[in-house]
Amino acid sequence: GPRTELFTRDQNNSLNSFRMIYIYTDGAASGNPGPGGYGIVMISGKYRRELAEGFTFTTNNRMELLAVIVALEQIKSPGSAVLVTSDSKYVIDSVVKGWVFNWLKKGFKDKKNPDLWRRFLKIYKKHNVKFEWVKGHNNHPENERCDALAVHASKATKLKVDKGYQESIKKPKGLL
């Protein structure tokens, strides 16, 4: 892939050269809501890492968003230049069109997934993140790989509980 060299000054004002970090993500939930998972491919220079995790009961959008969060949380140096490639219009439009910043101002009133959006904003601020949308299932090799990782993770025998989602759908219990 293309190699982009970027230069930043660190605290000691010495010149640092580092490579662009490419992140590919995908989320899946069968039944939506249902068992779900996310898949991540991270590439920087010769470095490549794949991550995936499955959950018992969640939504497609939560998995798409969680994939981006988890990937960004792996990055050690603050201020890294990152390109996130995703097929999720939900995630990309919410950030690129600035909706999520308005939701935050209004305390995420009547908005879904506030737990994940708050976690996203915390890590998003630390880096220089750009987004690129790709059409899903369109023979984009890294995106296809993420899809396979996400689906495979969602079918694992030991799945985690998506606590944030479970909390959000709990019905308030009436007084007996």
Give the role of each language-model region.
Residues 12-17, 63, 100-103:
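Intrinsic low-complexity, intrinsically disordered segments enriched in polar/basic residues
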Residues 25-35, 69-145, 149, 154, ...:
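RNase H catalytic domain
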Residues 92-93, 170-176:
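Short, mixed-charge aromatic SLiMs
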Residues 1-19:
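N-terminal amphipathic/basic-hydrophobic helices that include classical n-h-c signal peptides
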